[in-house]
Amino acid sequence: MLKNKTKKTEVYALCRHISLSADKARRVIDQIRGRSYEETLMILELMPYRACYPILKLVYSAASNAAYSMDSAEVNLVISKAEVNEGTITKKFKPRARGRSYVIKRTTCHITIVVKDISLDKYEEIYSFKNPIWKNTIDVYSNGVVWHKK
Protein backbone atom coordinates (compact mmCIF):
# COMPACT_ATOMS: atom_id res chain seq x y z
CA MET A 1 0.00 0.00 0.00
CA LEU A 2 1.24 3.46 -0.84
CA LYS A 3 0.63 6.41 1.41
CA ASN A 4 0.91 10.09 0.56
CA LYS A 5 3.67 12.02 2.22
CA THR A 6 2.70 15.42 3.54
CA LYS A 7 5.81 17.16 2.24
CA LYS A 8 5.30 19.51 -0.69
CA THR A 9 7.15 18.46 -3.86
CA GLU A 10 5.96 20.98 -6.47
CA VAL A 11 6.13 24.75 -6.76
CA TYR A 12 5.02 27.00 -9.58
CA ALA A 13 5.74 30.35 -11.16
CA LEU A 14 3.13 32.34 -13.05
CA CYS A 15 3.57 35.22 -15.47
CA ARG A 16 0.52 37.02 -16.77
CA HIS A 17 -0.17 39.51 -19.56
CA ILE A 18 3.00 38.87 -21.57
CA SER A 19 2.86 40.72 -24.87
CA LEU A 20 3.34 37.60 -26.94
CA SER A 21 1.19 35.28 -29.01
CA ALA A 22 0.11 32.12 -27.19
CA ASP A 23 0.88 29.94 -30.22
CA LYS A 24 4.45 31.24 -30.43
CA ALA A 25 4.96 30.69 -26.71
CA ARG A 26 3.56 27.14 -26.95
CA ARG A 27 6.16 26.35 -29.60
CA VAL A 28 8.88 26.97 -27.01
CA ILE A 29 7.03 25.48 -24.02
CA ASP A 30 6.53 22.16 -25.85
CA GLN A 31 10.31 21.80 -26.12
CA ILE A 32 10.99 22.16 -22.38
CA ARG A 33 8.08 20.22 -20.85
CA GLY A 34 9.33 17.22 -18.85
CA ARG A 35 13.02 18.13 -19.01
CA SER A 36 15.44 18.81 -16.19
CA TYR A 37 16.18 22.34 -15.00
CA GLU A 38 19.74 22.49 -16.35
CA GLU A 39 18.75 21.05 -19.72
CA THR A 40 15.91 23.57 -19.93
CA LEU A 41 18.30 26.48 -19.39
CA MET A 42 20.57 25.26 -22.18
CA ILE A 43 17.66 24.82 -24.59
CA LEU A 44 16.17 28.24 -23.85
CA GLU A 45 19.49 30.06 -24.20
CA LEU A 46 20.16 28.52 -27.61
CA MET A 47 16.71 28.75 -29.23
CA PRO A 48 16.36 31.74 -31.58
CA TYR A 49 12.81 32.75 -30.62
CA ARG A 50 11.59 35.92 -28.93
CA ALA A 51 9.43 33.89 -26.54
CA CYS A 52 12.50 32.29 -24.94
CA TYR A 53 13.50 35.26 -22.79
CA PRO A 54 10.29 35.63 -20.72
CA ILE A 55 10.09 31.84 -20.35
CA LEU A 56 13.73 31.73 -19.22
CA LYS A 57 13.02 34.36 -16.57
CA LEU A 58 9.99 32.36 -15.45
CA VAL A 59 12.02 29.14 -15.14
CA TYR A 60 14.59 31.01 -13.02
CA SER A 61 11.76 32.28 -10.83
CA ALA A 62 10.29 28.79 -10.40
CA ALA A 63 13.71 27.43 -9.42
CA SER A 64 14.23 30.16 -6.85
CA ASN A 65 10.73 29.48 -5.48
CA ALA A 66 11.68 25.81 -5.12
CA ALA A 67 14.94 26.69 -3.38
CA TYR A 68 13.12 28.98 -0.96
CA SER A 69 10.08 26.89 -0.11
CA MET A 70 11.44 23.32 -0.37
CA ASP A 71 15.20 23.83 0.18
CA SER A 72 15.88 21.83 -2.97
CA ALA A 73 18.96 21.90 -5.17
CA GLU A 74 18.72 22.92 -8.82
CA VAL A 75 20.11 19.54 -9.89
CA ASN A 76 16.98 17.73 -8.66
CA LEU A 77 14.42 19.96 -10.39
CA VAL A 78 12.28 18.85 -13.34
CA ILE A 79 9.70 20.86 -15.30
CA SER A 80 6.62 18.76 -14.54
CA LYS A 81 3.95 21.02 -16.07
CA ALA A 82 4.20 23.94 -18.43
CA GLU A 83 1.17 25.57 -19.97
CA VAL A 84 0.32 28.65 -21.98
CA ASN A 85 -3.13 30.24 -21.96
CA GLU A 86 -4.42 33.13 -24.00
CA GLY A 87 -4.75 36.44 -22.22
CA THR A 88 -6.55 39.65 -23.01
CA ILE A 89 -6.47 41.23 -26.45
CA THR A 90 -5.93 44.97 -26.65
CA LYS A 91 -7.20 46.75 -29.76
CA LYS A 92 -5.57 49.76 -31.37
CA PHE A 93 -6.92 51.68 -34.32
CA LYS A 94 -4.70 52.60 -37.24
CA PRO A 95 -5.98 55.38 -39.49
CA ARG A 96 -6.42 54.39 -43.12
CA ALA A 97 -7.41 56.16 -46.33
CA ARG A 98 -10.75 58.00 -46.71
CA GLY A 99 -11.33 58.34 -42.99
CA ARG A 100 -11.46 54.65 -42.25
CA SER A 101 -9.70 52.89 -39.44
CA TYR A 102 -8.09 49.48 -39.21
CA VAL A 103 -8.02 47.43 -35.98
CA ILE A 104 -4.67 46.14 -34.79
CA LYS A 105 -5.00 43.37 -32.20
CA ARG A 106 -2.24 42.92 -29.62
CA THR A 107 -2.48 39.47 -28.07
CA THR A 108 -1.19 38.56 -24.63
CA CYS A 109 -0.71 35.24 -22.89
CA HIS A 110 -0.37 33.74 -19.42
CA ILE A 111 2.42 31.22 -18.78
CA THR A 112 2.51 28.79 -15.85
CA ILE A 113 5.52 26.59 -15.08
CA VAL A 114 5.39 23.92 -12.37
CA VAL A 115 8.70 22.56 -11.08
CA LYS A 116 8.94 19.25 -9.25
CA ASP A 117 11.75 18.06 -7.00
CA ILE A 118 12.54 14.45 -7.91
CA SER A 119 14.65 13.81 -4.81
CA LEU A 120 11.54 14.06 -2.62
CA ASP A 121 9.56 10.91 -3.27
CA LYS A 122 5.84 11.48 -3.43
CA TYR A 123 4.95 8.14 -1.93
CA GLU A 124 6.44 6.14 0.85
CA GLU A 125 6.12 2.40 0.69
CA ILE A 126 4.51 0.62 3.60
CA TYR A 127 4.65 -2.96 2.35
CA SER A 128 7.70 -4.61 0.89
CA PHE A 129 8.06 -5.80 -2.70
CA LYS A 130 8.42 -9.39 -1.49
CA ASN A 131 4.77 -9.50 -0.41
CA PRO A 132 2.85 -7.16 -2.76
CA ILE A 133 -0.87 -6.63 -2.28
CA TRP A 134 -1.51 -5.94 -5.96
CA LYS A 135 -0.67 -9.48 -7.04
CA ASN A 136 -4.24 -10.24 -8.15
CA THR A 137 -4.29 -7.53 -10.87
CA ILE A 138 -0.64 -7.49 -11.91
CA ASP A 139 1.48 -10.56 -12.56
CA VAL A 140 5.17 -10.89 -11.91
CA TYR A 141 7.55 -12.80 -14.17
CA SER A 142 9.89 -15.35 -12.64
CA ASN A 143 12.77 -12.86 -12.81
CA GLY A 144 10.76 -10.25 -10.85
CA VAL A 145 9.69 -7.94 -13.69
CA VAL A 146 6.15 -6.58 -13.30
CA TRP A 147 3.68 -6.52 -16.20
CA HIS A 148 -0.01 -5.57 -16.45
CA LYS A 149 -2.63 -8.13 -17.46
CA LYS A 150 -4.81 -7.06 -20.34
Curated annotation (Swiss-Prot):
The family database entries (PROSITE patterns) matched by this protein are listed as: RIBOSOMAL_L22 (PS00464)
Q: Where is it found, in Gene Ontology cellular component terms?
A: large ribosomal subunit; plastid
**SUPFAM superfamilies membership:** Ribosomal protein L22
- Name the Gene3D superfamilies on file: Ribosomal protein L22/L17
Signal peptide position in this chain?
none
A single GO molecular function term of this UniProt record:
rRNA binding
Taxonomically, the superkingdom here is Eukaryota
Q: Which UniProt keywords apply?
A: Plastid, Ribonucleoprotein, Ribosomal protein, RNA-binding, rRNA-binding
Tell me, which GO biological process terms does this entry list? translation
* Major localization class: plastid
Its annotated compartments are: Plastid
For this protein, the record's HAMAP family field holds:
Ribosomal_uL22_B
For this chain, the family text in UniProt reads:
Belongs to the universal ribosomal protein uL22 family.
Q: How does it assemble?
A: Part of the 50S ribosomal subunit.
The record describes the protein's role as: This protein binds specifically to 23S rRNA.
List, alphabetically, the PANTHER family matched: CHLOROPLAST 50S RIBOSOMAL PROTEIN L22-RELATED, LARGE RIBOSOMAL SUBUNIT PROTEIN UL22M
* Protein name per its UniProtKB record: Large ribosomal subunit protein uL22c
Per the UniProt record, the source organism is Orobanche minor (Small broomrape)
The opening ranks of the lineage are: Eukaryota, Viridiplantae, Streptophyta, Embryophyta, Tracheophyta
